[in-house]
Design a protein with these regions (language model features):
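Carbohydrate-recognition beta-sandwich/jelly-roll modules
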Residues: 1-193
Length: 193
């Protein structure tokens, strides 16, 4: 009842003039349409719940950096943000009586969690991880000019991105929380002692 998707970054090729800045792995996995009932769990606090088709189309989509902002990056505006303390999202479809947890395992420090409801940009409720792979900054060409050039890191990190999907026929919030607890206990057995 699990699927593990791996993306070895050292095997990704790209034109150096057009670096791969962000990557989404299976972005619409488990997406549901406007006729389906259910919800998404996002890592807001101890687990926030976003109901499908909730009609809040005037609000921004949910987006949060896993483990918080990367302070190695320049910031030009003050942003009130929350950080995700755990690399998890879940989709529970009550219409089909199916659900899954998606855990960003390897490469989670590059991840941002994004979730949105139907009726804004498309007709789907979805949740996904977006990985920021190559960072860029605007650099001044010289002190005598106000021209800037976008400069990127030299290459992709030498890591493998890994997402684990844990499937279930349970759609109750507490059952999904227990499923995640079971995953953590299995992965980190010494923490339960």
């Amino acid at each position: 009842n699990q699927l593990v998707v791996k993306v070895p970054m050292k095997e990704i090729s790209y034109n150096e003039d057009y670096p791969i800045v962000k990557l989404q792995v299976l972005p619409y996995m488990g997406a549901s349409n406007v006729d389906e009932k259910g919800y998404m769990i996002v890592p807001e606090g101890t687990g926030g719940k976003i109901n499908f088709n909730n009609g809040k189309t005037g609000q921004q989509r949910y987006q949060s950096d896993v483990y918080g902002w990367d302070y190695g990056q320049a910031r030009t505006t003050i942003v009130d943000e929350t950080k995700s303390n755990f690399p998890l999202l879940a989709i529970a479809n009550e219409t089909t009586q199916s659900s899954f947890l998606c855990v960003a395992e390897e490469g989670s420090s590059y991840a941002t969690v994004q979730a949105d409801i139907s009726g804004k940009n498309n007709g789907y409720n979805y949740g996904t991880f977006i990985y920021s792979l190559i960072h860029g900054e605007n650099m001044d060409v010289s002190t005598k000019s106000d021209t800037t050039v976008r400069v990127y890191e030299d290459g992709l990190p030498n890591e493998t991105l890994s997402q684990r999907y844990i499937f279930s026929d349970k759609t109750d919030y507490s059952d999904l929380a227990k499923e995640y607890r079971g995953y953590l206990q299995k992965k980190y057995p010494s923490l339960g002692k």
